[in-house]
Amino acid sequence: MIIYKGPVFQAGSKDRENKIMKIALMNEFSQSSKNPTILGELKKVVEPMGHTVYNTAMEAPLVPQDVPEAYTEDNPRLTYLHLGIQAALLLNSGAVDFVITGCGTGQGALMSLNMYPGVVCGYCIEPTDAYLFLQINNGNALSIPYAKGFGWGADLNLNNIFTKAFGSPKGQGYPASGKESQNRNAAILSTMKTQIAKPLVEALKSLDQNMVKEALIPRFLDCFYAGCKDDELKAYVDSVVASK
């Protein structure tokens, strides 16, 4: 029997429903050429709502081919594995409230983010996915495929996804009669993830520290330090940055 003692975030709470959010966009190398399109559609939707967008991972590379000269010190080659590290640090520190991510299929980024406590990432192909995930599962990240099915009208689909994701109060349930049960299960899931995982700093220290260093690019650090509310995570990031 699971005894619920309180979630990482209170699913469906009034604070979460009404708050102005800080949203991080994270792209990896294979789809980074689409970053300007994704960023533009995200800002077009959420900035009029009062939300702030941070572009914390890759921008468009210098050339479309995956070759060394495509990347720079400020825009290095990041994979979906790096995105999980970024998301875990930003969400658990309180530096951001929500993450939009993805990769070619969306599956790699989904798995990478969901490894970590405090991160509940859903898979989103079309607007109904975004709406139902946030009403039923009340998570804090969405992974989108940016190659598979990303053809004519993709920018319109992104716009509609972001509108459904951020245009309604979260955790209201679908159907509405299921709200109480769905909110309870979403909260228990967050608690279970914390219970079965290592504490985040311990988990990050167990990783290849070179990979962690690679994830801490300047755009990420600007966002992290501007909003970090967790002294332990800040101290860990400080130590990694100092060792670079």
Regions found by a protein language model. Give the residues of each.
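Short glycine/serine/threonine-rich phosphate/pyrophosphate-binding segments
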Residues: 35, 84, 106-112
